[in-house]
Amino acid sequence: MGRREEMIAKIKELMLQPERIRNIGIAAHIDHGKTTLSDNLLAGAGMISEELAGKQLVLDFDEQEQARGITINAANVSMVHNYEGKDYLINLIDTPGHVDFGGDVTRAMRAIDGVIIVVDAVEGVMPQTETVVRQALREYVKPVLFINKVDRLIRELKLTPQQMMERFSKIIMDVNRLIQRYAPEEYKKQWMVKVEDGSVAFGSAYYNWALSVPFMKRTGVKFNEIIDLTLKGDHKTLRQKAPLHVVVLDMVVKHLPNPIEAQKYRIPHLWQGDINSDVGQAMLNCDPKGKMVMVVTKIIIDKHAGEVATGRVWSGTVKSGQEVYLINTKRKARIQQVGIYMGPERINMEAVPAGNIVAVTGLRDAMAGETVAEEPIEPFEALHYVSEPVVTVAIEAKNVKDLPRLIEALRQLAKEDPTLHVKIDEETGQHLLSGMGELHLEVKLYKLKKDWGIDIDVSEPIVVYRESITKPSPMVEGKSPNRHNRFYIVVEPMPDEIYNAIKEGIIPEGRIKNPKEVAKKLAELGMDYEIARGIVDVYNGNMFLDNTKGVQYLNEVMDLLIDGFHQAMDEGPLAKEPVMKVIVRLIDAQVHEDNVHRGPAQIYPAIRTAIHCAMMKSNPVLYEPYQKVIINIPYEYMGAVSREITQRRGQLVDMKQEGEVMTIIAEAPVAEMFGFAGAIRSATSGRALWSTEHAGFKRVPNELAQQIIRQIRQRKGLDPNPPTEKDVCPLF
């Protein structure tokens, strides 16, 4: 039996023993060495050859990732590790560190129970580190810490052991501060990382060595020996004395939970259904004999197998030929092939039980985040994405005959990556693709050209603005065209506390199932409890409340009212841009008794016009997306960089100096950031290292707002003059 067959046999055996499984991820700031770490773990576990690891970047198997040297898609690999005489199956999901791909990180967190946080010893904890730690803890994922690139402290910065220890302590303190801030109450203390118990390891993923206190105690290897070998450049001996994969995977097995342990506390948090039901108990106990439930975390399109859905099996067993329900899309499907991962390749299996990461084909309508089950159940909570699409490009096929394929290609892209939004502009016939940043869209468009071979014209990137209001409106009446239905509403600006609670997932998006509980939370955030009890729907950071008393037939049209509310929020009155931070309250209504007179054609315009008219009476304003920019540069380029930022309406938020290196943190409007990459490169002769992340929305200065509204309206083929209250409010 060859090495490969042995490995497959071992994986088959271990996947049936959930206490021997660890589902983990690696998360870090861009370029802190995450993919190099995962490759060297794979090599150590015998999945790829050692010489290639680190240079090979197995997980970056998309040619774009290898060209750009960053990880774009979270891929999954499995490996076997022996700890204290027992074999363990470790499923490792690699996640991107670049902010434009934050959606992948969020989805991967759903499938894993533990995460290795990688921090560069030279740079320390960075903004993106904070983002990934927050995402992990929000999904109840337990962290351990790997401090990487320690060789640079020894060789480049020439620090003494004492200085290095100080550097490590600071990083550990910073990470623990994040855990303290974001971990669930009951785990704030328990999940702190400590050098003494081995939940912290440090080393060099590139040179393939690592140390932890338990490893040093067990083997007698001293830190000073490692320093000497590093200074001599004897990497081979280093690798043999302190092999990276042994130290890191030992830490994983010892400190990160198996699926049986993890599901006990994760399921009640991630799943909204009844924990005491049969399926609830099966998931709590990770029971392979229960009803099958899995959550899809990623869809990839494979040239041979078609759509492959990767996901986590929470209970039961996934078998080929099984008939399943896709809960969110409300469709049935039949599972065709079932497999698990070995390295990056999929190995077909007959069946895969609870606690594993599975790859299946046959779920044609599934999207990432879909709950797949043997029978209809409550879906898992919606995935929370950290940022939202802020940049749009318009796409047209150069050749008209490619149009049907372009539509199909865009549909597939949006399925693979739910953080992409695809919209067809009915008026111009253009396809609008919105993403989380310039790089995100660039990568997706490259994929579209390469995988589908379609020639396309792409517009300059356009920023997605938001519309909002600054004061409460008076009561406004909306009438249906047949005048038989009337709705009386007011709109109010949403307080920041409530908006942030929605963004952090404390207040759920979508139709509200348990208004009393949500009202309690809203009351804690300062809303009047009596008003809050009327909460019906939360949509893209806006809220719809029913504060009527005893209106007949209102329930019959509530779904239509919510649809109309969504339409009004998708396109605001100023420039048809999405609306944010608006609370719409229905105060009173008259609804016709005969449902012929209260269909969509009557209700939609009534509620939509009323909301837009009320917004025009509430001092409507435009918001624009901002980016946080983190730049590392040699000290002498300080002036050039701050000029570059202030020219772009940006502000410096913070500056830190370590040795010769300055770290500048700034915020600037996305609209001004196009072409920043080239500008910063020439301003610093290519010496700047920089990354960006979404920094929310800020109000557009008044002197620019009118001009921007005109530009947006012109681009959309509307009358360029900004509308007045008279234009929007009907003359009833």
From Swiss-Prot:
UniProt keyword terms in alphabetical order: Cytoplasm, Elongation factor, GTP-binding, Nucleotide-binding, Protein biosynthesis
Entries under Pfam families matching the protein: EFG_C (PF00679), EFG_III (PF14492), EFG_IV (PF03764), GTP_EFTU (PF00009), GTP_EFTU_D2 (PF03144)
Predominant location: cytoplasm
Subcellular localization, as worded in the UniProt entry: Cytoplasm
Annotated Gene Ontology cellular component terms: cytosol; ribonucleoprotein complex
Residue intervals of the tr-type G domain: 19-260
Alphabetized InterPro entries for the sequence: EFG_II (IPR041095), EFG_III/V (IPR035647), EFG_V-like (IPR000640), EFTu-like_2 (IPR004161), G_TR_CS (IPR031157), P-loop_NTPase (IPR027417), Ribosomal_Su5_D2-typ_SF (IPR020568), Ribsml_uS5_D2-typ_fold_subgr (IPR014721)
Entry annotated with the keyword Transcription: no
GO terms of molecular function: GTP binding; GTPase activity; translation elongation factor activity
Residue positions where Diphthamide is found in the record: 597
Source taxon at top rank: Archaea
Amino-acid positions noted as binding GTP in the UniProt annotation, renumbered to this chain: 28-35, 94-98, 148-151
CDD domains: aeEF2_snRNP_like_IV, EF2, EF2_II, EF2_snRNP_III, Elongation_Factor_C
Function as written in the Swiss-Prot or TrEMBL entry: Catalyzes the GTP-dependent ribosomal translocation step during translation elongation. During this step, the ribosome changes from the pre-translocational (PRE) to the post-translocational (POST) state as the newly formed A-site-bound peptidyl-tRNA and P-site-bound deacylated tRNA move to the P and E sites, respectively. Catalyzes the coordinated movement of the two tRNA molecules, the mRNA and conformational changes in the ribosome.
Family, per entry: Belongs to the TRAFAC class translation factor GTPase superfamily. Classic translation factor GTPase family. EF-G/EF-2 subfamily.
Protein's recorded name: Elongation factor 2
